[in-house]
C-alpha cells in the first residue's frame, strides 16, 4: 500500500469545497491527544503550555500601541504547535487577525470559529488561491502579473479579491516590488489601480535583527507607501500598513504602524527577547537499560567507545521523530532531573544516553529532550549548537512527527 497516497485520499474525501483537493497539500494531520494515556505508545511527544501561550500573548500586547492591530502568525501549523489546539486561546484573547501560509491552515483557522481577518503571508499559486476563495483569505502579491491573474479569478467568480501589496524595502528579496527601480513605482500603481483587485494593505518584511537597519529601511518604506497611496488614489484610512515581525515590534516601536505580525515571540522563540519562554517541551521515555563493559562501541559508525563499564538507557526517539543524528556525542537530555550525555549518533528510532551516574533510572521514565525538568533546562541555544540548525528547523518537524499534548 502507498501510505502517502492513502493519506492524500483521506484528505480528498474530507474536503468540503469544490474542487475536492482544495486542502490536500500540505496535509495537516491532527496530532492532538487529550489524555496522557494516549501518548503511551508514541516514540516521543510534545507538551504545549496553553498558559504560557496566553501569557506570551498578554505580555506582547502590553508593548503594542493601543491603535495597532495584532495579526498572529500561525504558519507551519502554528510553528509546529498546532493551529487547532491554539485557536481557542487566540479567540479568547480577541486577536483580530491571523496569518497563515497554506489553504489547509486557513481551513483550520476558519473551522475554529474565527471570523476575523485572515492573511496569507507568502505568495500563492493561482490555483491555490482559487481553491480557497470561500475562506476569504487576503492574499500577498508583489507583481503586476499576479494582479492580472487575480483579477481574472475575481471576474470569473464575480467577487473582489483583497490583497496586501508587498514592497521590497525591507530587503528580503523573496517577493515585493523594488521601488528604487524605474519600473517599480509604475508597477505598484498599476497593481493598486487594477480592477477587481482591492489593495487593503501595503507591507514589507525585515530579514535582520538590527534595529538601525530596520529604522533606515522603515523610512524608505514609509516614503514609498505614502507616494503609492497618493499616486494610486488609495484612501489612507482603508489601507493597513504593516512591516513589523516579532523582533521589530518589540525593539523598534515606531515600526508598529497599523498592524504587527508576531510569530516566534508568541511561541517563545525570539532569541533577542528571552523574557518570552517557550511554550513547548519535547519528551520521550526510557525503553530499556543496558550494561556495557569498558571498550564497547555504541551506535552506527562506532563513534563512541566506553572508557569504563557503563549503563546505557535506550530512548524511544530518533531522527525520524525530529531528534537529529548530529545530537550524538554532543547533546544532553534530562532524566530524573539530571543531565545525561547522548552517546553515539542518534538512530532513526533510537537514541542512547549514558546514565551510569544517575541513580534510580528505570524503563518507562520520562526524558526531556528540550525544556525543563525539575531544576534543569535544555535551552534553545543548546539545541541549535548541537543540531547545527536554527531552532525553527527542529520544532516545525517535531509538530508534524509527534503527538501534541496540551497542558494548562
UniProtKB/Swiss-Prot annotation:
Keyword Disulfide bond: yes
GO cellular component entries: cytosol; periplasmic space
Entry keyword Signal: yes
InterPro entries xref list: Ala_racemase, Ala_racemase/Decarboxylase_C, Ala_racemase_C, Ala_racemase_N, Ala_racemase_pyridoxalP-BS, PLP-binding_barrel, Racemase_Bsr/Lyr
Signal sequence residues: 1-24
Cofactor(s) recorded in Swiss-Prot or TrEMBL: pyridoxal 5'-phosphate
Gene Ontology MF terms in the entry: alanine racemase activity; arginine racemase activity; lysine racemase activity; pyridoxal phosphate binding
EC numbers for this chain: 5.1.1.10
PROSITE patterns: ALANINE_RACEMASE (PS00395)
Similarity field: Belongs to the alanine racemase family. Bsr subfamily.
Protein name in UniProt: Broad specificity amino-acid racemase
Species assigned in the record: Vibrio vulnificus (strain CMCP6)
Lineage per the UniProt record: Bacteria, Pseudomonadati, Pseudomonadota, Gammaproteobacteria, Vibrionales
Amino acid at each position: 500500500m502507498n501510505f502517502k497516497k492513502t493519506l492524500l485520499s483521506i484528505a480528498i474525501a474530507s474536503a468540503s469545497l469544490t474542487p475536492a483537493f482544495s486542502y490536500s497539500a500540505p496535509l495537516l494531520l491532527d496530532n492532538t491527544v487529550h489524555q496522557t494515556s494516549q501518548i503511551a505508545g508514541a516514540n516521543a511527544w510534545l507538551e504545549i503550555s496553553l498558559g504560557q501561550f496566553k501569557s506570551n500573548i498578554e505580555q506582547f500586547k502590553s508593548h503594542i500601541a493601543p491603535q495597532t492591530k495584532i495579526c498572529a502568525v500561525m504558519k507551519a501549523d502554528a510553528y509546529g504547535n498546532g493551529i487547532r489546539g491554539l485557536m481557542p486561546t487566540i479567540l479568547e484573547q480577541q486577536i483580530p487577525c491571523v496569518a497563515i501560509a497554506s489553504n489547509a491552515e486557513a481551513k483550520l483557522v476558519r473551522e475554529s470559529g474565527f471570523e476575523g481577518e485572515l492573511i496569507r503571508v507568502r505568495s500563492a499559486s493561482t490555483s491555490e488561491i482559487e481553491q480557497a476563495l470561500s475562506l476569504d483569505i487576503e492574499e500577498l502579491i508583489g507583481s503586476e502579473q499576479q494582479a492580472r491573474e487575480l483579477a481574472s479569478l475575481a471576474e470569473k467568480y464575480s467577487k473582489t479579491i483583497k490583497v496586501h501589496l508587498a514592497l521590497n524595502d525591507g530587503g528580503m528579496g523573496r517577493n515585493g516590488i523594488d521601488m528604487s527601480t524605474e519600473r517599480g513605482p509604475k508597477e505598484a500603481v498599476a497593481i493598486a489601480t487594477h480592477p477587481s483587485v482591492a489593495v487593503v494593505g501595503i507591507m514589507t518584511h525585515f530579514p535582520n535583527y538590527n534595529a538601525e537597519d530596520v529604522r533606515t529601511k522603515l523610512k524608505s518604506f514609509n516614503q514609498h507607501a505614502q507616494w503609492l497611496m497618493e499616486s494610486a488614489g488609495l484612501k489612507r484610512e482603508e489601507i493597513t500598513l504593516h512591516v513589523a515581525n516579532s523582533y521589530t515590534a518589540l525593539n523598534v516601536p515606531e515600526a508598529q504602524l497599523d498592524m504587527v505580525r508576531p510569530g516566534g515571540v508568541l511561541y517563545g522563540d525570539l532569541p533577542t527577547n528571552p523574557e518570552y519562554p517557550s511554550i513547548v517541551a519535547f519528551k520521550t521515555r526510557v525503553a530499556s537499560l543496558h550494561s556495557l563493559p569498558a571498550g564497547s562501541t555504541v551506535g552506527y559508525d562506532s563513534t563512541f567507545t566506553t572508557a569504563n563499564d557503563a549503563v546505557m538507557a535506550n530512548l524511544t526517539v530518533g531522527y525520524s521523530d525530529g531528534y537529529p543524528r548530529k545530537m550524538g556525542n554532543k547533546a544532553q537530555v534530562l532524566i530524573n532531573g539530571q543531565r545525561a550525555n547522548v552517546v553515539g549518533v542518534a538512530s532513526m528510532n533510537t537514541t542512547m544516553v549514558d546514565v551510569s551516574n544517575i541513580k534510580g533510572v528505570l524503563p518507562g521514565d520520562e526524558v526531556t529532550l528540550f525544556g525543563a525538568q525539575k531544576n534543569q533546562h535544555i535551552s534553545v541555544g543548546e539545541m541549535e549548537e548541537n543540531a547545527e540548525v536554527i531552532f525553527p528547523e527542529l520544532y516545525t518537524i517535531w509538530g508534524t512527527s509527534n503527538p501534541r499534548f496540551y497542558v494548562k
